[in-house]
């Protein structure tokens, strides 16, 4: 017998035609690249806490997690960028701690009718003001307008001309709900009515972060390529870093799940630099935003996670720079990080964003990895695209080997077996690796085939005759990050002489 049949017996005598299926050469499946968002749900919501829940729409998130909840808002922002991709969520248990509060104090009687425009995050809340309105009346109208929008992250109460805004959840993330008056200003036809004075005290006082240990357990061994979390405190990220590690975590050989964590932090340059210096993990990207950014940090996380998901699913090696964070309001002009400040952030493990024509965009999604085990500067894992490319390459190889050689015998090179036999040799596997590399080269994932082939090693293990050891040395295609040009001008070229 030459051809290897998985099930048809070699001694079959019953006539006549017998066929079996073999799909080993047909697999062309690509990973769906599912995403995961971690966030808080309202205490009276119906969603199960610390359980994986698939989330196809923002409407469903509002229904099960509660409108205005952190999780519902994150899903809404995510779906604004990625309406198609597979999305899962985990609703975490609210932490022990305090609830963030902010105030809007109104003074002076209105001397003209108009509209008060208060921005809570990226959402504008408007209250009508009539000539002669006292602060108490204006405050009551503003509080009513806030409470009329169930999708806001805060509730409002008015007393003696002061509107107190209270976050819907306890915890640190409530401090990062920005408040602003007339974001677009006079140019955008936003003006405070004459006679009305408004003083805003930013959201503050929120304390506590949820324990993510149960959350991580709920993730199980389900693959998630893009994991968004608004909890950027050290303890929360340490828990996720442990889950992502290269030894026993999602990037370890025994699990092979891969994925990347996206989080964000709002702060001054010095605060963000100090924050970046506390981390050194290639599987986490922490984006830094200016104190004046007019979008809640949890929504920024969801937007950035979604934008990466959309881009990386299409091409893991293509840079995510310029990706629009749809619906986010950037810090006003004059309050944004300068080029020098952005450079400092990128030198300290903080991913950056920039604003162009009022649109907030990804500038560079670096990881927090900065130094090797000896504390020496190391740029091998600088960009998150490198990690996504690595996952893509490994999955491609795994798909080929597990599809084409699931039940093969192993022999030495030069063994004279008949055609059709389910036997593989190191040389055959090396050819398979080279063919796969060529395919990925045409797809723009890798480069330098000749050098790759020169350094590729495929050999039988000297101690275990059933094992093949492979040294796979891919050269990843890089991203165009910097275009440097020296404009060496002339006033006029001299004519050449014969």
Language model features with spans:
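Structured, hydrophobic secondary-structure cores that serve as assembly/anchoring elements
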Residues: 1-86, 321-326, 332-334, 339-344, ...
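A glycine- and small-residue-enriched flexible loop/hinge signal that marks low-structured segments
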Residues: 36, 79, 83, 122, ...
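Extended, beta-strand-rich, solvent-exposed assembly scaffolds of outer structural proteins
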Residues: 57-63, 109-178, 227, 246
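Disulfide-bonded cysteine-rich modules in secreted/extracellular proteins
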Residues: 97-110
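Bacterial flagellar/type III secretion structural subunits and associated motility module proteins
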Residues: 108-112, 116-120, 184-211, 219, ...
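Extended Gly/Ser/Thr-rich low-complexity repeat segments
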Residues: 119, 173-189, 486-489
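Surface-exposed ligand/attachment interfaces on beta-rich extracellular proteins
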Residues: 133, 158, 206-214, 418-425
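Extracytoplasmic/secreted envelope proteins and their assembly/folding machinery
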Residues: 136-143, 213-216, 237, 241, ...
């Amino acid at each position: 017998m030459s051809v290897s049949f998985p099930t048809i017996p070699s001694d079959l005598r019953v006539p006549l035609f017998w066929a079996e299926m073999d799909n080993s050469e047909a697999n062309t499946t690509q990973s769906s690249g599912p995403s995961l968002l971690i966030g808080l749900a309202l205490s009276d919501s119906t969603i199960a806490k610390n359980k994986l829940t698939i989330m196809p729409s923002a409407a469903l998130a509002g229904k099960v997690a509660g409108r205005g909840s952190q999780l519902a808002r994150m899903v809404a922002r995510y779906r604004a960028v990625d309406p198609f991709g597979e999305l899962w969520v985990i609703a975490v248990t609210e932490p022990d701690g305090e609830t963030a509060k902010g105030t809007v104090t109104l003074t002076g009687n209105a001397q003209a009718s108009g509209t008060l425009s208060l921005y809570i995050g990226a959402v504008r809340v408007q209250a009508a003001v009539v000539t002669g309105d006292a602060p108490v009346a204006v405050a009551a109208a503003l509080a009513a307008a806030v409470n009329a929008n169930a999708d806001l992250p805060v509730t409002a109460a008015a007393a003696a001309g002061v509107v107190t805004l209270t976050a819907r959840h306890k915890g640190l993330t409530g401090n990062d709900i920005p408040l602003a008056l007339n974001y677009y200003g006079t140019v955008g036809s936003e003006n405070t009515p004459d006679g009305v004075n408004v003083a805003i005290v930013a959201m503050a006082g929120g304390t506590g972060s949820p324990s993510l240990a149960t959350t991580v357990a709920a993730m199980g061994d389900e693959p998630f390529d893009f994991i968004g979390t608004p909890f950027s405190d050290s303890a929360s990220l340490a828990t996720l870093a442990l889950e992502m590690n290269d030894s026993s975590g999602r990037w370890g050989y025994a699990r092979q799940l891969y994925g990347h964590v996206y989080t964000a932090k709002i702060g001054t340059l010095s605060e963000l630099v100090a924050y970046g210096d506390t981390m050194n993990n290639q599987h986490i990207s922490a984006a830094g935003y200016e104190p004046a950014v007019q979008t809640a940090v949890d929504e920024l996380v969801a937007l950035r996670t979604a934008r990466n998901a959309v881009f990386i699913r299409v091409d893991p090696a293509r840079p995510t720079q310029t990706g629009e964070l749809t619906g986010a309001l950037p810090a006003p002009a004059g309050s944004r990080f300068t080029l020098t400040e952005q450079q400092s952030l990128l030198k300290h493990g903080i991913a950056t964003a920039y604003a162009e024509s009022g649109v907030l965009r990804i500038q560079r999604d670096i990881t927090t990895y900065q130094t090797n085990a000896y504390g020496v500067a190391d740029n091998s894992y600088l960009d998150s695209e490198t990690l996504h490319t690595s996952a893509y390459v490994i999955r491609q190889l795994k798909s080929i080997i597990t599809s084409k050689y699931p039940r093969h015998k192993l022999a030495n090179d030069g063994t004279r077996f008949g055609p059709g036999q389910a036997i593989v040799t190191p040389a055959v596997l090396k050819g398979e690796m080279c063919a796969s590399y060529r395919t990925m080269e045409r797809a723009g994932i890798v480069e330098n085939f000749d050098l790759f082939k020169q350094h590729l090693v495929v050999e039988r293990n000297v101690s275990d005759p059933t094992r093949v050891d492979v040294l796979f040395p891919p050269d990843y295609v890089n991203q165009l990050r910097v275009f440097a040009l020296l404009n060496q001008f002339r006033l006029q070229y001299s004519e050449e002489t014969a």
